[in-house]
UniProtKB/Swiss-Prot annotation:
Membrane-spanning residues: 77-97, 100-120, 141-161, 189-209, 217-237, 334-354, 370-390, 408-428, 449-469, 492-512, 538-558
This protein's GO CC annotations: membrane
Pfam families cross-referenced by the UniProt entry: PTR2 (PF00854)
Homology family: Belongs to the major facilitator superfamily. Proton-dependent oligopeptide transporter (POT/PTR) (TC 2.A.17) family.
Name of the featured protein: Protein NRT1/ PTR FAMILY 5.3
InterPro entries on file: MFS_trans_sf, NRT1/PTR, POT_fam
GO molecular function list: dipeptide transmembrane transporter activity; tripeptide transmembrane transporter activity
CDD domains in UniProt: MFS_NPF5
Lineage top rank: taxon: Eukaryota
Length: 586
């Protein structure tokens, strides 16, 4: 290889190896590195969902908690698991970098899994068995037992805070934005990334859930812990192939400096003279393997932060690039806001959908019954199939019509998922009304121990459609917040996805408790320990209306959203969302 060829072979996006040396495209990154990341994700998701999928059943049957309490404990924990990535993203971007942050967090994650396995294995760490079907008459878990169990759960949540925002970003970093082939592969990466997630989830919601229900919780959780250990081992094997981006300082501090500087100069008159705005020389960016961003007209108030007024203090004067990076993170906030309600939908399939399944006939044969949480496997399978069809058929077809490399825009993809969410909750409400009717006809309204003579597969449509919806909205969320974040804030951008999930789960807890308390005062509560006496059909229809209102707000938000400028100049910059509202009105 000639000197010129060696020079051309180096990546141009600033990626380095662990020692800080430039890396070659031919020797690092791309799919040969991503294969380790993808395999890691399969086993890690198997481990995580091996715990979370059946958690509401464990809390009900083993810790003897009621419907609302167990559901809220699950959603609060899952919400925390999605909230801690904000801290993980900060540590990665400001201090240790993604790789080191990920490795340290993985050790904490594994510790939490091991402690959780012990808590479900040792008899002294859980309350005695209860023979009655009414959990209100069972002995509750002691303070120490709850402390060990939830301590392990939240240790696990802290660990995931450093893995979730960084692992997908590490994977995306393996593709050089300045190489046309790499850029095309990155578009497919997020689809196959989600494919790996749901492949692991499918195994967890079928095999591991069955083991927990029929063999033992200790063995089921033990297998999850071994799966996590194996996933970390696989990730470390690929270390020499990974490309790394250097930490570029705290994004929170940078954003705070821009906002403070602009407020301090609020009374300063704006200037049309570009020389009055501060920016670093291009060579200084080149030395850091970074790129300047040109000034834009959006959120013009923040431009004052880069206006030269005499003081050069960093809290009074920022670069144009820092201002534009802050603008971009702020411009994504309205989009983030309208993803909260869709995230609440995921909380329903992890809690109330599963509790519904416990009331139905779960027998496949005389000797085999399907665990209620295993219906999540159909959601996963539906999403796996949908992703493949979307990536291999839908994108190619739509690309010819729209000229967009992705087929349709990311926000259009989100919108389709939101429409499906409305349909899902309408179907769920109708199905639940039918379930209550069958229970009443067989005199089972006040019974909890006897299953309703109605197959658990009656719930299948809502599970399958949820997988289809996730193939649109969840992948679009992940890719949108990564793609639209500035280069120096990619981990923070990815953590927007985690924030969406966290807020959605916490909102679900608040909503469930509020609706339960309010409807109790009106007479028959919508959510009770005995679901046959509840009115989940009303609750689900309320969700359908909530999703409809959120979708209308979504259309307003995207009408005014402008995509960020692409520093590689390989795509149109500052392009408005093309006629999505018009498309929906046609």
């Amino acid at each position: 290889m000639t000197v010129e060829e060696v020079g051309d072979d180096y990546t141009k996006d600033g990626t380095v190896d662990l020692r800080g040396n430039r890396v070659r495209r031919s020797q690092t990154g791309r799919w040969k590195a991503c294969s380790f990341v993808v395999v890691y994700e399969v086993f890690e998701r198997m481990a995580y969902y091996g715990i979370s999928s059946n958690l509401v059943i464990y809390m009900t049957t083993k810790l003897h908690q009621g419907t609302v309490k167990s559901s809220n404990n699950v959603t609060n924990w899952v919400g925390t698991s999605w909230l801690t990535p904000i801290l993980g993203a900060y540590v990665a971007d400001a201090h240790f970098g993604r790789y080191i942050t990920f490795v340290i967090s993985s050790a904490i994650y594994l510790l939490g899994m091991a402690l959780l396995t012990l808590s479900v294995s040792l008899p002294g760490l859980k309350p005695p068995k209860c023979s009655t079907a009414n959990v209100e008459n069972c002995e509750k878990a002691s303070v120490i037992q709850l402390a060990v169990f939830f301590g392990a759960l939240y240790t696990l949540a802290i660990g995931t805070g450093g893995t979730k925002p960084n692992i997908s970003t590490i994977g995306a970093d393996q593709f050089d934005e300045f190489d046309p082939k790499d850029k095309i592969h990155k578009h497919s990466f997020f689809n196959w990334w989600m494919f790996s997630i749901f492949f692991g989830t499918f195994f967890a919601t079928t095999v591991l859930v069955y083991v927990q229900d029929n063999v033992g919780w200790a063995i089921g959780y033990g297998l999850s812990t071994l799966g996590l250990a194996f996933s970390i081992f696989i990730f470390l094997l690929g270390t020499r192939l990974y490309r790394h981006k250097l930490p570029m300082g705290s994004p929170f501090t940078k954003m705070a400096r821009v906002i403070v500087a602009s407020l301090r100069k609020a009374r300063e008159p704006m200037s049309s003279d570009s020389t009055r705005f501060y920016e670093l020389p291009p060579m200084e960016y080149a030395s850091k393997r970074a790129f300047p961003i040109h000034s834009t007209s959006s959120l013009r108030f923040l431009n004052r932060a880069s206006l030269k007024t005499g003081s050069t203090h960093k809290w009074r004067l920022c670069t144009i690039t820092e201002v534009e990076e802050t603008k971009q993170m702020l411009k994504m906030l309205p989009v983030l806001f309208v993803t909260f309600v869709p995230s609440m939908m995921l909380a329903q399939i992890m809690t109330l959908f599963i509790k519904q399944g416990t009331t139905l006939d779960r027998r496949l044969t005389n000797n085999f019954s399907i665990p209620p949480a295993s219906l999540l496997g159909f959601t996963t399978f539906s999403m796996l199939v949908s992703i493949v069809i979307y990536d291999r058929v839908f994108v190619k077809f739509m690309r010819k019509l729209t000229g967009n490399p992705r087929g349709i825009t990311l926000l259009q993809r989100m919108g389709i998922g939101m429409i499906l969410h409305i349909l899902i909750m309408i179907i769920a409400s109708i199905t639940e009304r039918y379930r209550l009717k069958v229970a009443a006809e067989h005199g089972l309204t006040h019974q909890t121990a006897v299953p309703i003579p109605l197959s658990i597969f009656t719930l299948l449509p809502q599970y399958v459609l949820m997988g289809l919806a996730d193939a649109f909205i969840e992948i679009a969320k992940l890719e949108f917040f990564y793609d639209q974040a500035p280069e120096s804030m990619k981990s923070l951008g990815t953590s927007y996805t985690s924030t969406s999930m966290a807020v959605g789960y916490f909102m679900s807890s608040i909503l469930l408790s509020s609706v339960s308390q309010i409807t109790k005062k009106q007479g028959r509560g919508w959510i009770q320990n005995n679901l046959n006496e509840s009115r989940l059909d009303n609750y689900y229809m309320f969700f359908a209306v909530l999703n409809l209102l959120n979708f209308i707000l979504f259309l307003v938000v995207i009408r005014f959203y402008e995509y960020r400028a692409d520093v590689t100049q390989s795509a149109n910059v500052e392009q408005k969302e093309p006629n999505m509202v018009d498309n929906y009105n046609e």
